[in-house]
Amino acid sequence: LVGSEMCIRDRYKVLNLFIAGVGTVGGNLLEQIRIQQPKLMRQNGLKLNVVGISNSKKALLCREGINLDNYLEELKENGEESNPEHLCEEIVKMNIFNSVFVDCTASPDVAALYETLMNNNVSVVAANKEAASSSYDNYTKLKETARHRDIKFLFETNVGAGLPIINTMNDLINSGDHILKLEAVLSGTLNYIFNTISADIPFSEAIHMAKEAGYAEPDPRIDLSGKDVIRKLVILAREAGYPVEQADVKRNLFIPEKYFEGSLEDFWKNIKDTDAGFEEKRQLLEAEGKRFRFVAKMENGACEVGLQAVDSHHPFYELEGSNN
């Protein structure tokens, strides 16, 4: 086995991947790896060896690599009962050279594993926003651990999905620039809702449509609260060099606090009460040639999020659908 591993390493650079989460994000990543693997090996001399796949209940681990043609079936039938702590212990015990933990979950329990993994020389790549938007002390500790261990802690997809926003910011800072101000639309869900509202589609119906289209969370109050936007803004501000906490961000809610209280059923029943007010505002904006945008701003470390009216001269005006 050792001889076989050395032979592969001689021919290719091998990255051994542990992938947590097999939902939309993790499933698409695994499919992309499966399709691109021959090309990566042929053109880049890179072998992505998926040695671990886990969901919230089971983990499938194999140091020789997992067949990605039927990994869901394998995970279901042959995966071990597992939880985040058990998964972390098994990864550390496997002690595989050049390994990367890829977090495709949204779980704070999984994010809590990063420090232990990194202290055992496992790099971390996270789609999960929990760690990078957690306390500033935890954020800096993880960054410092990665530097000290000469491994990676990457979270590019935390903001902007596939757009290289964080990497571009890092390049600017490393070349001597200072980022003084940021302004962005960071929620595809909210942008979809405000682009959908019309004389025929009230605010409450637009929220329903966002949920049905798969943009909104099962509990859309998470999106409407701006919490996800706040986390993204905090991450960007920190990467720009400012020691920002989530509690530091000024929130200008466009829905009264009372709608975030009670059950989800209460929310759906009561949110219709806001339709008339939003339609009145929409008509006024339409007459002025303006549109609603939920905007995140950072200036010299001061952060705020809130609803803003923009005219046709503003870069955010033409953002269609769920674009952000």
Q: Predicted segment positions?
A:
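Rossmann-like NAD(P)H-binding beta-loop-alpha module
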Residues: R147-D150, L154-A213, K227, I235
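ATP-dependent carboxylate/acyl-activation modules
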Residues: R9, K13-L15, H313-N324
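Rossmann-fold NAD(P)-binding glycine/threonine-rich loop
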Residues: S107-N119, K129-F155, A161, I166-M169
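N-terminal glycine-/serine-/threonine-rich beta1-alpha1-beta2 phosphate-ribose binding loop
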Residues: R11-N119
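Conserved active-site and cofactor/substrate-binding residues in soluble primary-metabolism enzymes
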Residues: A20, T24, N28, L48, ...
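Substrate-binding/catalytic subdomain of NAD(P)-dependent oxidoreductase enzymes
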Residues: T196-I197, E205-Y317
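Short, small-residue-biased leader/transition segments that mark boundaries at the very start
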Residues: L1-I8
